[in-house]
């Protein structure tokens, strides 16, 4: 979908008499969307994620976010973002990695993840690049590995990559005591269970794990609205949004 499409969908579902009084963008394209739609606020993604995570766990001290293409670990100290570690270069620890394998085996991501829950001998993929994991999985298939064992092995590898290659912890217990996991990859129960097994803890996975950034931005908009003297939003109306046009050009 698109930003415009999402906004139209929101407006179509608003109850009669309800209006948007404050707005906030975040994530990739945050400044662009804020400028294009004249939004009231724009906030960096890490802060939005913290707002969302602290809604579910006020004492959160670590946020692990694994999306389709990247992953990040946000450490919280004294209710403030203390450090951020990000991986964008390699997809071997991300959701797209599991999705690719599921499709290659003619499974949906959901069915592939479900298989992992019944694994008896998960294959050990360690913390490798996608290229090496591909060959390791193919070798395991030749040796007769069950789909469940492959799926569980991949779930473990996602977490091992996140913890030991990106965050570079020597002991998973170093992460924190109040951990919130989020990002679409954590909708996969096998990935969640792998994390809890390796980290030796119980993590909080909100049922909106895949849209925590947007939820955090909404919380920020609500909070800052309360501090405003002028209660009118600067955001374009739905009619103005419908009339938006754009042009593209190329230059050397």
What is the role of each PLM region?
Residues 1-20:
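N-terminal phosphate-binding loop and adjacent alpha-helix
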Residues 6-12, 30-67, 72-83, 167-170, ...:
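Conserved phosphate-binding catalytic cores of ATP/NTP-utilizing and phosphoryl-transfer enzymes
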Residues 28-29, 157, 170-198, 209-213:
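Glycine-rich phosphate-binding loops at beta-strand->alpha-helix junctions
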Residues 40-41, 45-46, 196-215:
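Conserved phosphate-binding/catalytic loops in two-lobed NTP-binding clefts
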Residues 72, 223-252:
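Acidic, glycine/GT-rich loop-and beta-edge segments that sit at the periphery of enzyme/chaperone cores
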Residues 78-121, 210-213, 219-223:
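Glycine-rich phosphate-binding loop plus the immediately following alpha-helix
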Residues 135-164:
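Adenine-nucleotide phosphate-binding core of ATP-dependent small-molecule kinases
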